Amino acid sequence: MLEKIYFYYTNDLHSDFEHWSRVAGYLKGAKANHNTKNESCWLLDIGDHVDRVHPIAEAFMGQANIRLMNDVGYDLATIGNNEGITLAHEDLFHLYDKANFQVVCANFHNVQGKEPEWLNTTVTIQSINGVKIGIIALTAPFNAFYELLGWYISPPYNTLARYIKELEESTDVIVFMSHLGINEDQEIARRFPQLDVIIGGHTHHLLRQGEIVNNAVITAAGKHCAFVGEVILTWDHSAQKLIKKEAYTTDITHLEKDQQTEETLHELFVEATTQLDQSVIEMKHPLDVQWFEHTEVMQRLTNTLKEWTNAEFAMLNAGLLLDHLPAGKVTYGDIHRICPHPINPCVVELSGDELVEVIRASFTKELMELTLKGFGFRGEVIGRMIYSGLTVETEFLSDGNEYVSKVTCNGEPLDPNKNYLVATADMFTFGRLLPEIARSKTKKYFLPEFLRDLLADTLRKSFST
């Protein structure tokens, strides 16, 4: 006898609810269809469902996301870095308390005491006809952030090696839910032939059809749930083995919306708006925001960052603030609207030479006009860099490009060999935006505060009537 086993999954929604009602309708319909046919079917989420960029996620600290997943009927989920490092310890500890699904993450640990009651290292599920399926999940080890919040992520390969033998002996099929990224998924498939399926996320890669690496089929559905993934396994009960593995992703952006989900989203948005309608200050004059010009609010915010982190200098890009603020009452919702990024303050150590190189790079047209999505940045462009504690003099070339002619502190040039503490946004410590910052061996992150918390302090201190 042949038995087909079905998994449907989502990954990296990032609280982008544009297509969520379509996702909900599609998944509920798929599950109902398989139940009618008496076929085994599970719904999975691979992490980063929560992202505090959206007011619903911000107001409810992720709890509304769990409600939405419950409504759809998810069976299993794992933790992404947006759940893991953008919530305070207590908020994450209780995030899944009301989940009607099992949460799996084998390398996630609480260093402040007992593990959350919802946390499972592995889970074993069973098909209608008795096929035992082992589920293991891992999340990306951003321990520089996790440890500041009271968590620890154990090394993925060591963790997998620890549990894989037990799963191999006790189950027929092993499914790995991975919030590690495509490169890690491929390497893990090469190293662990025991894995049958790797369902991925984190790096927002879209695999329209499954990719076979070693013994595993690898799949992932991009970002923001424009696609939903499906895995179909065929088990031969006579031969007692898996004879076929298929993986696909389906574009759901053209499907009809689930009206019940639409109503729930509307209710949550109204309630979130009410919760975020807490007055921060009253402003006598409107606040101007410009991405490519020096503004008072960006200068004051950069000054606050320098003072708050006790750094010698500070630098922030003007693109962090997305919109103006009107005169009158300013609420926390307004602050979230103009600074929605899950970006933390950080301090890096740079030599005088490295700092000057960073400053020169920041004034290039290429960086200022760079359209960026990722590293926590949820805006449009990087914009002009604003500095505190430094005087940066620039001139314009005949082609209109601006270049740095002089950098001083209290009228004196920087010592090229001296190390300085520079406060900035943590987004610059990732990737290649500003290589000198990313390469710095001394980085100190500040959590759970976001830059918008410092913006609120700045407004209270400098702009209140």
Which residue stretches match the model-derived regions?
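A short C-terminal boundary segment appended to hydrolase-like catalytic domains
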Residues: 237-330, 462-464
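Acidic, metal/ion-coordinating pockets
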Residues: 1-250, 294-298, 304, 445, ...
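Glycine- and acidic
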Residues: 8-11, 285-288, 436-437
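Feature captures C-terminal
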Residues: 17, 326-465
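Structural signal for hydrophobic packing residues in well-ordered secondary-structure cores
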Residues: 27-34, 161-164, 168-171, 192, ...
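Amphipathic, soluble alpha/beta structural segments
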Residues: 116-132, 151-154, 176-179, 183, ...
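Residues in well-ordered beta-strands of folded domains
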Residues: 104, 219, 316, 393-395, ...
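A broadly conserved detector of short glycine/acidic/proline-rich loop/turn motifs that flank catalytic sites
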Residues: 137-140, 222-224, 237, 319, ...
